[in-house]
Design a protein with these regions (language model features):
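Fe(II)/2-oxoglutarate oxygenase catalytic core
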Residues: 1-119, 125-158
């Protein structure tokens, strides 16, 4: 874990699992990634306790490919619709292409390392962006998750 806002778990997937996902995608084969979704939810539940809330359903895992030809905007993005944004880095053999996170308004940012198989999850309201990939291809899986009010939670006034 890096900090409480941006969390990195190395070896979430093995290099072999990542290569399998990339190669199947390149060959046009669809994959059932349910086991990865379940593993993500397990990690979130193990690392966070949500008083009065529970994790909603994980959005569909999207396979994303970035190249030097991808059009990039270096403006900071924010997603206020979800609670967490989740990225699984499938490879690290490309130049630049860093996920960057603005943690305060003085333009200093945290840059997550490029590590094959790592899981990065962060609060979706954090300003974030991707620096341009300068060579080769960057492959990730990306999804989001919302929090739902827990039906079992009893609200009380103190």
């Amino acid at each position: 874990m890096e900090n409480k806002k941006i969390n990195i778990i190395e070896n979430f997937l093995s290099k072999e699992e990542c290569d399998y996902i990339i190669n199947n995608h390149k060959n046009g084969k669809s994959l059932d990634l349910t086991h990865i979704s379940e593993k993500i939810v397990e990690v979130l539940n193990d690392n966070f306790k949500f008083r009065g809330y529970e994790l909603g359903d994980l959005e569909h895992l999207l396979f994303k490919e970035y190249t030097p030809k991808t059009k990039y905007s270096l403006k900071w993005n924010v997603n206020n619709e979800s609670y967490f944004t989740i990225i699984v880095q499938l490879n690290d053999n490309f130049d630049n292409g860093y996920h960057q996170y603005l943690l305060n308004d003085d333009e200093k940012y945290f840059q997550s390392p490029k590590i094959t198989g790592s899981l990065v999850f962060f609060f979706s309201n954090i300003k974030h962006r991707l620096s341009p990939v300068e060579s080769d291809f960057k492959y990730i899986l990306e999804t989001e998750i919302k929090l739902l009010e827990s039906p079992e939670f009893k609200k009380t006034l103190i």
